[in-house]
Every structure is written in C-alpha cells, then in structure tokens.
C-alpha cells in the first residue's frame, strides 16, 4: 500500500519536534514514529529517513537560511513546530531534485495549518519559504529537473509556477 507523503512529512515533523524537546538522537526519536503502514512501503521509509538525514547533515546551512529571512528574530523565539516545518521544506528544496518547489512549499503550509503552533503559523512559514525560495532560485542554488520543475525545458511549465513567479 502506498503511503502519502503528507503523512510521512507529518511524521518527520513529529520526529524533529521530539529531538528538539528531548535531545534524543535521530534514530531513537524517529524509529518509533514509523507506523506499520509506513514500514510496509519501502519508498516511504526511504523518503522519511532521507529527509531526516538531510536535515541532520545540513542543519547549520538550513538554519542559516531561516535566520537570514527572519529579520530581528532569534532562532530560539521561533516556535519549535514552525522551525522544523521550515527545516523540512528547505531540505526538500535544496536536496531533493525530484520534488517541485511548489509542492515542498505547499506541503509545509498545509502542515503548518494542521499543527497550528500559532494562529499565523501558516502565513509565517509561507513568507519565510517564499523569500528563501526566491533567493535560492535567483542564486542558482536550487537544481530541479523533470516535468513541472525549474530546469525543465519542455513547454509543460505549470500554470501555478508561472502565477507564483509573476506575483512577485
């Protein structure tokens, strides 16, 4: 049975939250969150572990992007849930070439709405990710290939990506 990535992303946020609150290591904090449904789907387990590992391996860099776009905010002032949603989305933007940027951003916004650490979490997450995405795109640091992605040379450019880029 195929596991939806939204559910996996929610588990990733729960693992990151556990790690931040308890100081647990990545393996012990994340293994107990893998449900039988996720465990049966090798692709789901692989995605779950790859995203967590990317965040762990590049946490300083990812946090640097968050800090850059949260003017006058200390990282410790950002709600733990929001901070980890941003980390997950930025890891996807930076290190997962097959995931369209719009998907990573939209998923982060929807998860922020669900976990709702504050009444403005989704707007905060959207603003930070949008600013960071535009920065990364203009500096050439996002490398995405394939249908509906940045470096796709075909005419199948997504209307939502065109709309997103013209709104700025």
UniProtKB/Swiss-Prot annotation:
GO terms for cellular component: cytosol. InterPro entries: NusB-like_sf (IPR035926), NusB_fam (IPR011605), NusB_RsmB_TIM44 (IPR006027). SUPFAM superfamilies: NusB-like. GO terms for molecular function: RNA binding. One of its GO terms (biological process) is transcription antitermination. Residues 147-168 are annotated as: Disordered. Keywords: RNA-binding, Transcription, Transcription antitermination, Transcription regulation. Residues 158-168 have a biased composition (Basic and acidic residues). Coiled coil: none annotated. The keyword Transcription regulation applies. Involved in transcription antitermination. Required for transcription of ribosomal RNA (rRNA) genes. Binds specifically to the boxA antiterminator sequence of the ribosomal RNA (rrn) operons. Belongs to the NusB family. This is Transcription antitermination protein NusB. It comes from Chlorobium phaeobacteroides (strain BS1). The lineage of its organism: Bacteria, Pseudomonadati, Chlorobiota, Chlorobiia, Chlorobiales.
